[in-house]
């Protein structure tokens, strides 16, 4: 599948702080691609570089085949991509109706049908000044302004921040519908349950480096907890095998997390005369925590 977003060895330094360290991203066209990481992991710096808001220290990146560090290309990218920032900055002196009308004037592919549906669904008060909106209402308005542009690519930074559970579910379903209409979604989040619900591709970043890049189905199929019980004491070294992300031994019990080769690992345990071997699924949250621990 072709990539809408690609980066090669992308780096961003702020003085001596290396915020992004050699990032190689590939966001498949037509996907809902989640960008997971702790606060300070490099997500926002990456998004800023992709959108031409910050220049890379080194490395390259392309969106729609256009260079992210070229001023003319960056303008073309922003004509075809919508960005909803985490801080949801809006013109506070305008009313809801005024900012919608103002934003609509810049985008020839504006979807008036979606605008009307979201106004009703989000219950946004057209005559209210933006400065008088609650945090949740501001988030809904910012999402409406991004979603209705009719863009090929939507880049969303913490899109559900400040929303209640009902509104979150509404937003997630809208994201799915936009992809069905042909858009690509690239969104950063630390809300892992939401990611697990809708994403079909997941990227994890830790301390500026990519630690996972895989289709969600593959992650769910391949990652497993394995626990084996042996008749005698065993060593962790006996299970330093391909595909083992982490292993711990406590007397006769070995517990490990595997990212692949689970059948081979189970066979190895049986060859070592394991009394029992249990294989269990692992959640995306647990995988994320494993990646963070491994990076410390």
Which residues fall in each region the model found?
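Alpha-helix N-cap/helix-start and coil->helix boundary motif
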Residues: 11, 97, 192, 233, ...
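C-terminal coupling/interaction segments
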Residues: 257-296
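Short, surface-exposed beta-strand/loop "edge" segments at domain boundaries and coil↔beta transitions
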Residues: 151-159, 233-235, 263-266
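Generic structural signal for isolated residues within well-ordered alpha-helices
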Residues: 102, 117, 218, 267-268
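ABC transporter nucleotide-binding domains
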Residues: 2-7, 12-206, 211-212
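ABC transporter nucleotide-binding domain
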Residues: 170-260
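Residues that line or immediately flank small-molecule/substrate-binding pockets and catalytic motifs
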Residues: 158, 230, 281
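A broad structural signal for short, well-ordered beta-strand segments within beta-sheet-rich domains
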Residues: 22, 223, 244, 274-276
């Amino acid at each position: 599948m072709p990539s809408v977003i690609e980066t090669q060895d992308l780096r961003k330094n702020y003085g001596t702080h290396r915020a992004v360290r050699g990032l190689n991203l590939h966001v498949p066209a037509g996907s809902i691609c989640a960008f997971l990481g702790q606060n300070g992991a490099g997500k926002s710096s990456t998004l800023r570089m992709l959108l031409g808001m910050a220049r890379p220290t080194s490395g390259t990146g392309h969106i729609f085949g256009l260079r992210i560090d070229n001023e003319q290309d960056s303008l073309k990218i922003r004509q075809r991509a919508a960005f909803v920032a985490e801080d949801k900055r809006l013109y506070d002196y305008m009313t809801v109706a005024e900012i919608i009308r103002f934003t609509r004037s810049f985008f020839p592919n504006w979807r008036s049908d979606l605008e009307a549906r979201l106004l009703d669904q989000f219950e946004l008060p057209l005559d209210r000044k933006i400065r008088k909106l609650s945090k949740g209402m501001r988030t809904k308005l910012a999402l409406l302004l991004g979603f209705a542009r009719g863009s090929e690519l939507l880049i969303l930074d913490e899109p559900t921040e400040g929303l209640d559970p009902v509104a979150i579910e509404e937003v997630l379903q809208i994201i799915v519908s936009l992809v069905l209409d042909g858009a690509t979604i690239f969104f950063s989040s630390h809300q892992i349950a939401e990611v697990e619900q809708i994403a079909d591709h997941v990227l994890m970043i830790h301390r500026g480096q990519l630690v996972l890049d895989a289709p969600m189905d593959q992650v769910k199929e391949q990652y497993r907890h394995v626990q084996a019980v042996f008749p005698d004491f065993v060593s962790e070294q006996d299970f330093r095998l391909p595909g083992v992300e982490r292993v711990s031994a406590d007397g006769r019990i070995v517990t490990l997390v595997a990212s692949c080769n689970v059948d081979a690992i189970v066979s190895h345990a049986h060859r070592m005369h394991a009394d029992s071997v249990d294989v269990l699924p692992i959640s995306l949250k647990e995988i994320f925590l494993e990646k963070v621990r491994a990076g410390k």
